[in-house]
Swiss-Prot record:
Chain's role: This enzyme recycles the H(2) produced by nitrogenase to increase the production of ATP and to protect nitrogenase against inhibition or damage by O(2) under carbon- or phosphate-limited conditions.
Enzyme class per UniProt: oxidoreductase
Amino acids binding [4Fe-4S] cluster 2: H232, C235, C260, C266
Residues engaged in binding [4Fe-4S] cluster 1: C62, C65, C160, C194
Residues in the signal sequence: 1-46
Subcellular localization, as worded in the UniProt entry: Cell membrane
GO terms of molecular function: 3 iron, 4 sulfur cluster binding; 4 iron, 4 sulfur cluster binding; electron transfer activity; ferredoxin hydrogenase activity; hydrogenase (acceptor) activity; metal ion binding
Subunit field text: Heterodimer of a large and a small subunit.
GO cellular component, one term: [Ni-Fe] hydrogenase complex
Full protein name: Uptake hydrogenase small subunit
Organism: Rhizobium leguminosarum bv. viciae
Taxon lineage: Bacteria, Pseudomonadati, Pseudomonadota, Alphaproteobacteria, Hyphomicrobiales
Modification(s) after translation: Predicted to be exported by the Tat system. The position of the signal peptide cleavage has not been experimentally proven.
Length: 360
């Protein structure tokens, strides 16, 4: 029986040198935020471990997650799809169709029982027996449950699979339901966003492929490596928030100076994602940098939380945790107090010096 190829076997067959492979591991480890030692571990894993089979299924969705995924720059999606993993099924991009495509699902399920990753883009509608989404002549929810039975783990791509997204907006006539409410007995990695950042998606796949385990997840099931901080925490406009400098109207002086967009509805203070660090389009920019506030697309229920331009209320603390209307006055008061304190200390020092000279 032939041994399955590893990632290293594939790239060597493609003519890629050992030096280029090592460089790839170093760059990928750095892009994932790992230390220098991780590059060696990554190289060893990719040299010895078989490529992980991946089944990519689509429910109710717009395919924006796939559109984002194919634009990954670090690592390049071609390296992920053609070398790092074995993408055995994806009905959006595969050449096979009809019964031929369906037979691939059954073959992979049987051959790689307990070893394949089930990546799900979109969600199943449960109303009317799941008849609002038909795949291969069957309700998508049935197909999802069938493939989940023998999966090693499930990746829920995007806000649709993670939370429900716009198709679950009230009154949700199709009863569109997130994956974790349907599959209850498998580990599920939620990678929310509408869509998720490309490098976040490939980063999750790279981590599983390299280390043979799931990344550490937060209490909502999201990878901590990408969803542990609020966008607001690392936003380059954060100093303007702390200084009480806000855009009050589109195209006002504050907007032209790049002031904080909080009053224009920016959801950065309550949204956990890597937009302000990883950014989009190969690290070029992200919505706030382009002049538009965050809409909170990686948070549960963002589609039913009112207008994207409705301002968040009762944001507490200096920085994020104080009311924005009072931040400017507070900052001015703190600065004024500091100046007064400095003047008082200086006066005391001068008086003490004069007394010491007089006593001498």
């Amino acid at each position: 029986m032939a041994t399955a190829e590893t990632f290293y076997d594939v790239i060597r067959r493609q003519g890629i040198t050992r030096r280029s492979f090592t460089k790839f591991c170093s760059l990928t480890a750095a892009s994932l935020g790992f230390g220098p030692g991780a590059a060696t571990a990554m190289a060893e894993a990719l040299e010895t471990k078989e490529r992980v089979p991946v089944i990519w299924m689509h429910g109710l969705e717009c395919t924006c997650c796939s559109e984002s995924f194919i634009r990954s720059a670090h690592p390049l999606v071609k390296d992920v799809v053609l070398s790092m993993i074995s993408l055995d099924y994806d009905d959006t991009i595969m050449a096979a169709a009809g019964h031929q495509a369906e037979s691939i699902l059954a073959e992979t399920k049987e051959k790689y029982k307990g070893k394949y990753i089930l990546a799900v883009e979109g969600n199943p509608p449960l109303n009317e027996g799941g008849m609002f989404c038909i795949d291969g002549g069957k309700p998508f929810v049935e197909k999802l449950k069938w493939m989940a039975e023998d999966a090693m783990a499930i990746i829920a791509w995007g806000a649709c699979a993670s939370w429900g997204c716009v198709q679950a907006a009230k009154p949700n006539p199709t009863q569109a339901t997130p994956i974790d409410k349907v599959i209850l007995d498998k580990p599920i990695i939620k990678v929310p966003g509408c869509p998720p950042i490309a490098e976040v998606m490939t980063g999750v796949v790279t981590f599983i492929t390299t280390f043979g385990k799931l990344p550490e997840l937060d209490r909502q099931g999201r990878p901590k490596m990408f969803y542990s901080q609020r966008i607001h925490d690392k936003c380059y406009r954060r100093p303007h928030f702390d200084a009480g400098q806000f855009v009050e109207e589109w195209d006002d002086e504050g907007a032209r100076k790049g002031y904080c967009l909080y009053k224009m509805g920016c959801k950065g203070p309550t949204t956990y994602n890597a937009c302000s660090t990883v950014r989009w389009n190969g690290g070029v920019s992200f919505p706030i940098q382009s002049g538009h506030g965050c809409i909170g697309c990686s948070e549960d229920g963002f589609w039913d939380n009112g207008s994207f331009y409705d301002r968040l209320t009762n944001i507490h603390q200096f920085g994020i945790e104080a009311n924005a209307d009072k931040v400017g006055m507070t900052a001015a008061g703190v600065v004024g107090g500091a100046i007064a304190a400095h003047a008082a200390v200086t006066a005391v020092k001068r008086l003490t010096t004069k007394r010491e000279k007089a006593d001498a």
